[in-house]
Structure formats: C-alpha cells, structure tokens
Amino acid sequence: MEPLMGMGVLALMGAAATIAGTTEDLESDVGSQSNPNSQVQLAPQMMYPHRIYNKAISGEPPSNALICAIGGTVASVLMTANLSVIFAIAIGALVASAVHGTYCITAYMGRTASQKRFRQPIYLDILRSHTPVMMGYAFITTFCILVVSYIMVAVLAHPFPLTLLAFIWGITVGAIGSSTGDVHYGAEREFQNVEFGSGLNAANSGNIVRKAESGLRNGIDNSWFCAKFGGPVTGLAFGMTVFLSGWVTAVFNPAISLTMGWLSVAAGVILVLLLIIWNRKIEVAARKAFGPYKEEEEVAA
C-alpha cells in the first residue's frame, strides 16, 4: 500500500475510534457503569437514595468486549452470506445493542431491588428513559469498533479475524474509558460539593450529589456534563491509541526491509517516551497551578 493511502486509512480508523471512545464513556456515565459506581451503589446504604441509573453489569472492558464480539460475530456471519458490509456491520451493532439493553435492564432491576431494605426505589421512568440512550451509545460504539476491525482485516490484511479484533478493541476502549473518562465523572460530577483536590474523606462515602441544576439528578444529567470534557478526552485517547499504533508501521513499513522494521520499533519506543515526558510535564504543571493541599500547608506551618 502506498504511504499516502496508508495514512488515509489510519486517519479513518482514528476518526472512528475517537467516536467510539467518546460514546463508550458517555454510555458508562448514563448508566453509572464505571469505577465511581461504587459510590452510587453505596449511597442508599448510607441513607442517600437517588435517581441515578445503577447498572454496572461488569467492568467496562469485559462489557464492551462482549458487545463488540457479539457485533463482530453477527457481522461476520452476514458477510459470509454475501450481505453488504455496511448492512452487516449495522445489523451486528444493532444485535449487540439489544443484548446490552437487556443486561442494562436486568442489572438495574436486580441491583436496585437488592437495596429495598435501604428504601431505594426502582424508578420505572428512569428505566424507560435511560435504557434507550445507553443502547444508542452502545450501537455507535460497536459500529465504530467494527469499522476499525473490518478495515484492519480487509485493507491492512491483518491475520486476526474480525470477531477477535473487535473483542480486543472492545477491551481496549473499555479500559481507556474506565481509566480516563471515569475520573471526570467520579471526581468532578459525583462530588461537586467537595472542594477540588481535597480527596474523598471516608465520612463522605456515598454522599454523592443528588440534586441537579433543575430537579433531582439522573444519569442523563451526568452524561450531559461529561460530554463537555470526559467523553471527548476518552475519545481522543482511544483515537490516538489506534492511530499512533499504526502510524509507525505506515511510515516505516517492515515489509520493505529489515532495517525499516527496526526503524518502526525505534520510532514506537521514541513515541512512547515522548508521551511519558509530556504526561509528566502536564502533571507537574497542574500541581504547581493548584498548589499543595491545605492540610499539608497547615502541618508545615
């Protein structure tokens, strides 16, 4: 493949991955399927009932791996039957989103019903309004992951089958969403009533923000907030992962010669080192900008 064509293919994959990462994070924010879900689950036990959709089917990586693998399996079967690629991928994503919606409903009903002793109600309006939103986000995520996987198989001649690639990318996008976007949801949304940078005192466990800008807060309110930063950052992280992982071999194609293969390895190592240094500089700059915690200042005084 020509280098220019290869870069175009990588750009398309990066764009699809960016969308997938964004929708994956926002889906987890609507249903609170993320690391901060522990506080959503704990809140009724601490006598803080709420209207936040509490599903947490599993961790985000296995959950997204499941729906992407289901979508990839259905799409592969349909393409084997000579169905159009676009229709096969769309139908695969639709089936995956339906399965995901089923898990959402059973998880919400089961987890909330188990908290009856803590007087946590099951809100049927929350179930009806939030589940279609999560299914829509899951459809977009699965569709984009299948697009990336199909391009790798059909255009880049990757040796792995479509379903396995979709499974791997599903784990990846779930892991990135769990480590990137969840910080915004947990620290900046669930505990907006706590001073920034102060950490979570044990006395505040479960005391999440339950009142919204208007009325009581729900999962869609959280998704609206996280769409401003957490979702796009997750999409950017996943898009960069997909694009940069293929960029080094597109520029230094190992198929040309052994030297180019080693150059691609060196370029990858240099790229990782640059990202580590950049991340460290951002962290140091943030700490200098916000300063030390007040408790540390008082102890020093």
Swiss-Prot record:
EC number: 7.2.1.4
Membrane topology designation: Multi-pass membrane protein
GO BP: any one term: one-carbon metabolic process
Reaction(s) catalysed (UniProt annotation): 5-methyl-5,6,7,8-tetrahydromethanopterin + coenzyme M + 2 Na(+)(in) = 5,6,7,8-tetrahydromethanopterin + methyl-coenzyme M + 2 Na(+)(out)
Cellular-component GO terms for this entry: cytoplasm; plasma membrane; vesicle membrane
Keyword terms, alphabetized: Cell membrane, Membrane, Methyltransferase, One-carbon metabolism, Transferase, Translocase, Transmembrane, Transmembrane helix
Superkingdom of origin: Archaea
Self-association state and partner proteins as the record states: The complex is composed of 8 subunits; MtrA, MtrB, MtrC, MtrD, MtrE, MtrF, MtrG and MtrH.
A GO MF label: tetrahydromethanopterin S-methyltransferase activity
Protein name (database record): Tetrahydromethanopterin S-methyltransferase subunit E
Family according to the record: Belongs to the MtrE family.
Main location: membrane
Job of this protein: Part of a complex that catalyzes the formation of methyl-coenzyme M and tetrahydromethanopterin from coenzyme M and methyl-tetrahydromethanopterin. This is an energy-conserving, sodium-ion translocating step.
Keyword Isomerase appears in the UniProt entry: no
Pfam family name, one: MtrE
The keyword Membrane is annotated on this UniProt entry: yes
Residue ranges crossing the lipid bilayer per the database entry: 85-105, 130-150, 151-171, 232-252, 258-278
Signal peptide (from-to): none
Cell location: Cell membrane
